[in-house]
Structure formats: structure tokens, C-alpha cells
Amino acid sequence: MLNADYLVRQGQLKLLEIKDSDIRILTLEQARDAVDKGIHIGGAFSAVVPFVSLFYGGVMNLDVVQPTRPGQDLFVLSKGHAVATLASIYADLGYFDRSVLKNSRSRQSILNGHPGPILPGIPISTGPLGQGLSVAQGFALIGKRNPAFDSFCLTGDGELQEGLIWEAVMYASYKRLDNLCVLVDKNSGQLDDTKQLVFPLLELVDRFKSFGWRVISVDATQYGPVLDALREFKFSPRDGRPTAIICRTRKGFGGFSSVMSGHKIEIPDSLTEQEIDMQRQRRELRAAEFLRFFEALESGGLGGAARDRLLAMAKAMNLNIESGRKKSPALQTIAVSAKTRKAPPRDKAIRYDPALLPKLDKAKEYSASGVITLAMRAFARDPRVVTIDADLASTSGLEAGVGYVDSSRAINVGIAEANMMNIGEAFAAMGYNAWVSTFCPFFDWKVLRRIAIGYQERIEAAQMKGGWLNEGHGLDLTFLATAPNFETKTNGGTHMGNDDSLVFDGIAHLKIIDSSCPQQVLSIMKWILEGNRGLVYLRILRAPSGVLYDPDFRFAFGQGYFLRRSDADRVVMISSGRGVFEALSAADLLAKSGIAAGVVDMPSIDEAMILDLYDSGKRIIVAEQNNGFIWSHFQRVLFRERKNIDSGRLVAINTLAGNGKPQFIHSATYSELLDQFGLAPGQMAEKVKKAVSR
């Protein structure tokens, strides 16, 4: 005997198939109307069944009106090639108007070739493969707190060739993130070969299981198995294991033409219209089959209960069932208007008691990490402060400080820097003031660049007319870079931070700061915790140093500071980090020779000061224990703002090779490194003497 649950399930699967047709039609129309008529069609179509099951199967708790409301489930599209399908679904759900689907990929559109938070409902930017799962894992970590929620992610199987995926897989299992569900679109194709992987990932189920995951392998050419797997994750008892649903399908599944199995293609209009027409015919057949099934259900008893539930399910899918004696049966798609409202502003300022901050004595030396530990004991009392280390917590001081207050917010991912950075982004996207830390050369450029792209899109989405985000919805994410310049000394070139500032200087929106003293570090931390500082790359000294600044010092980004100055100065030495101490010592030596020298600490680039110093007519010495970060900006500013430049008054001392090319540095003691590059106080003093004698 049939029961109501069975009848509802059969009807639900038929409704999902109808929705499948709607989404494929929207996606094809999107390709037809794109500025380049292009689409990653194979991966977009293979993902439709998992997508539709997830968003219309009743397994996600979403607030389309307020996508940033805490406590709702989150979704990350790691395989960015499926953005067209996701955009079709989000337009259908009401995250934005369907008009957004037209003219996609164009300069005027917010719908790009890969997803990003300029598009309503999208939390992060994805595209570089392997990173989305890592961020989704970060969301799952947050979802273990209150209010609790689940984190979903869709990856491709080719994407699993990325090492970062397995960093996240290992760590998610270790952290028992049973609120994390990953759907793998196993379409067995990728860019270079759409019919097979470049190298096969055999025994994928066993691979995930070996890392402690619960794995469900399903036929993703049908809705029943995928929906059952999602319901098992969502509603069955949990035991600490993350869930991976392996969705076995093929590239372009659900399309009619063989062209639909391609990677990124431009579809001729004639073929697109042919494909759309055939999809519409399929929809008509599916709708007719559902309506026959629905009409056969009795109006009372079990059939009546099933009808009522199916009517509610259809409404949730934006489908309208017309049925009754006075009407011909019909099943129409409801084109909803945009529902998403502008997010409420976020107050990002961290609350703390200043009396709890460390008091530094100018007569003593302190390590930056030690000061950070003591400061974080005060800052971390605000639950929005979180830190993530990668097996170098002893050099950052973060874990010891935050862990003293709340160990659950003092995270250490082990030797997995890329995973660390993505987890940090997840926390920052949810409104936390997040800090991640490792040695300067160990930050991942590809990850940092993607995060910065997402940051830019979040700012654009907050500032643009009709944007869905608001003030305070950027990212407050600090990259605490330890052991910069010569601080790693005998560890050798792989650990030496003499080039990181210049490499990362090309990352848009990244605020680079090279701190010189413990009091300055404390002031920089206070500045960051005021909130809305964006992406900050903060370099700190490893070994202890003296205190240069008074307790009331207030850091401002883009400002240099005179540590020594007089009207008699014939030369000004500019430096940052520990180089400032060497410049001060050089100034002492010069004073004994009767030469007055000013000293500037420039932790971040002060363009106005650069111009003022040049216009003063004094000799300028830019001395840096790296490949010339300040010097590169000095040249850039002068050539942009001044027509005639007297280069004879400018002297650069740094770690560039004699021909001006970048180079790496071999192991040596700190004093040996100073001598090697002419950065010892005596050497700098001699350079100054030669400069002023010309």
C-alpha cells in the first residue's frame, strides 16, 4: 500500500526534473546573451543535478532576503566554471533580477566569468582551483559556534588534483567538521581533455574515507540518489565526520547536442536556439507527467496530504500548479523579482580595555611576538577576534595570546599556509577581525591574490548603486609576516624575507607595513582593531628590539615618522624595520664627524613625505634590509610628480645585486649580512660622508 511519504517523494523528484529544465534553459539563454556568447557549458551542465537537488530539495536553510544574516547555511562554488548554472539558480531564487543574466561577462555586468561577491549571495571570489573547499571548511568552523549552521561546497573532480584540496580534507576531518558537506562533480573531464581526467583519481571514495570522511557515491544523472545523499547528510545523526558526496556524471550531461560536452565554448545562436527549444520540449513532457501524477492523487486521505505537501514544495521551487475541475492542468514557472535587500552595516570596531594592554619601558627590549601575545590577551576578549597559525605560532605570538582567552579562536592548521589563509578569509567574510601568520616567504601569492579580488568585489558591492553589501562588509584580515628582511639570518634564502614586500606590492588593496619597534607594533594592532582596515600585510621583527616610540604614539597608514631631525641636517636616512636602528646608529657616528643627519622610519609608504624630502634639497639615503621596497616607491613617486629629478642627491642601499637585479640571500649571521650589503652603521656613515662631499 502506498503511503503519503512515498507519493510525496515521487512527486518531488518530478518537480526537481522540471526545475532542472528551467535552470538549463536559463543557463543557455545566459550564454546566448553573454557579451562573448561564451560559457563553460560542460561543467555548468554536469553540475545542474547536484545544484538543483541542493537548492530546491529542501536541505538548505537560506535567507534570500538577507544573505548575510548569521545562522543560515552557506554555499561555496569551488569549481568556478559552473558559475552560469549558479547564477541561473540565484536569479530564479530572487538574489537578483533575471536581467543580470543578460550581457554577462561584459564590462557593465556584475556577472563575471567566475563567481565573486559583487554578485548578491556570493560570499567569496573563486576561480583559482582548489581554494573554495578550503574556505567552505573555514565557514564550517564558524558554523560549529553559535548560531550553528551547515557549510556546503561544490568542487570538480579535476580540481581534486590541487594539493590545497587535501590540506582542507585532512584538517576538516581532524576538526570533526560534520557540518561540512562537499559535493564532487565527478564528470571525468577537464580543460585539456573533456572526456577523461589528465590523470585519473582512482578509488576516490577510499581516498576521502582514508582521511576520516563519510563518503556517499551516487549516480548524479538522477535526482533520487543525489537528494537521498543530501538528506542523509542533513537529517541523519552526525558522528564528527565531514561528508563527501561523489556525484558520478559526465561533462555536458542533460544537454542534447554533443557540443554541450565541451569546456569553454562559444555557441552559435542557431545551435543555442535549437538546444533551448529541445529543453523546452523536454520540460513540457516532464510537466505533463507530473500533472498526470498530481491529478491522480485523491483529494482526501493520503492523496490529499500528498497534494498539499507537493503544492508547498512547488511554491518553494517557484513553480505554480494549476489544477482543478474548472482549470486545465498547468505548471508554470514563477519569475520572482529580486528579494535580496542591502545588508545592514557591520560595526567592525573591536572592544577592549586599554588598561589591560602591555606597558613598555623604553629602557628595555621586547620581542614583537611577546608584545602581540600580551596585547591579544586584551583584544581577544572581544569574541570577533580570531587567529590562525601554520606551525609558526611561536614566532607570531598570536596563538598564545588569543588562546589565553579562548583556545577555540586560536587556530593552528599545521604546515598548510594556503589552507590557513583561506580559513582566515572565511572568518573575515563573516565579520571577524582575523589574523593569519607565517614566515614572510611562506604566504601563497595565488591565494592572496584571489582573496584581494574578493575583497575588491565586496567593497564594490557595498559602494555601488543597488549593491547588496554595506559598510563593514569588507574583509578585516591581517597577514602577520614574521622574520622579515634579515631576521631569519642563518636559515638561508628559502626563509629570508628580502623580496616579499616587492612581490606582494603588486596585489591590489594590500596595505604593506614594515614595523620597527614593539611600541609601534602595539599601535598598529590598535589601528587594525578599529575595524575596516581591509587587507594588511604586517611585517614584524623576530628578535627583541628596543622601544623607539612613546606610549601615546598613534600609527597612521601612509605616514612616515622623523626619529631624528634638526635644521642643520644635511642628509636624511630613510629605513624601516630593524634598519631604523642601524640608521640611528649611523646618525650617531655622523654626528661625531660633524655631519647632522635626520632619520625617518617609514613603516608604510608616505608619498607626501617622499616629495617633501626630495624638495628639501638634502641628500637622501634609502637604506633597506630587502630588495628596495621603499626605494621602488621613491622612484615611482618622483617620476610621477616631478619633471626634473636630481638623481645625484639620492642613494639607495639594499640587497639588490650590483646590476640592480633582485637576488636571494645565503645563510649568514645578522652582522655578516649587514656587512655584506653595506648596511652596517659604519658603512652607511661612510656612504653619507661620500655623498655630502660631492
Task: Show the residue positions of the predicted features.
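Short beta->alpha junction loops/turns
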Residues: 79, 158, 222, 416, ...
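Glycine-rich, histidine-containing beta strand-loop boundary motifs that form or position
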Residues: 79, 155, 184-186, 219, ...
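Residue-level signal for short, function-critical loop segments
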Residues: 81, 158, 186-188, 391, ...
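Active-site glycine- and acidic-residue-rich loops that bind
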Residues: 158-165, 222-227, 515-522
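Residue-level preference for nonpolar/small residues embedded in alpha-helices
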Residues: 164, 199-200, 419, 496-499, ...
